[in-house]
Amino acid sequence: MKPEAGDGRSGWRWVATFDLILRLAAIVATSTAVLAAMGKTFVVVVNGVACFYLLMSLPVSIFNIMRPGACPANRAVLTALDMVTVALVTAGALVAGILYLVHKAGDTHADWFSIWSQLDSLSYLAVLALILHVLLSGSILYKQALNIMF
């Protein structure tokens, strides 16, 4: 069934096409960053994970072009996973920047593990806060879904 001119689904085709183009550009950027950062394990792993996610999301993006509006949950899931990927790549870039500044202006023998060992208690608090955030968000979404259904 083809979308009619006034049903609003045909307007999303250009958004889905732009999404596919951005995903292809991001794949090129992350794979290039992986090659440029050889030797920095954390940065390589982060960019590799981002590149793998982008490759796996291409079929969903192509599906959104072929059938705009068929499954609105696809866009919501892709948006959420894209935000996680952006946060992960940003963390990798920040780690690379911090290590560069530490080597340039401070201790030349400093590495990520020596910096992280000073923040050990903070990492446990951050993980605890993340777990609580996910649990509370899930319970709120569940309650909202129940309110919508009934």
UniProtKB/Swiss-Prot annotation:
Q: Which GO terms describe its cellular component?
A: plasma membrane
Cited InterPro entries: CASP/CASPL, CASP_dom, PCMT
Q: Which residues lie on this side of the membrane: Cytoplasmic?
A: 1-17, 63-82, 143-150
- Write out the GO biological process terms: protein modification process
Q: Does the keyword Kinase apply?
A: no
UniProt topology in membrane? Multi-pass membrane protein
Spell out the subcellular localization from the entry: Cell membrane
Q: Where are the transmembrane segments?
A: 18-38, 42-62, 83-103, 122-142
Q: Record keywords: Cell membrane included?
A: yes
The molecular function GO annotations come to: protein-L-isoaspartate (D-aspartate) O-methyltransferase activity
Q: What UniProt keywords are attached to this protein's entry?
A: Cell membrane, Membrane, Transmembrane, Transmembrane helix
Which ranges does the record list as Extracellular topological domains? Answer: 39-41, 104-121
Write out the similarity annotation: Belongs to the Casparian strip membrane proteins (CASP) family.
Summary of subunit composition and partner proteins: Homodimer and heterodimers.
NCBIfam families in the cross-refs: A_tha_TIGR01569
Protein name per its UniProtKB record: CASP-like protein 2
Species assigned in the record: Picea sitchensis
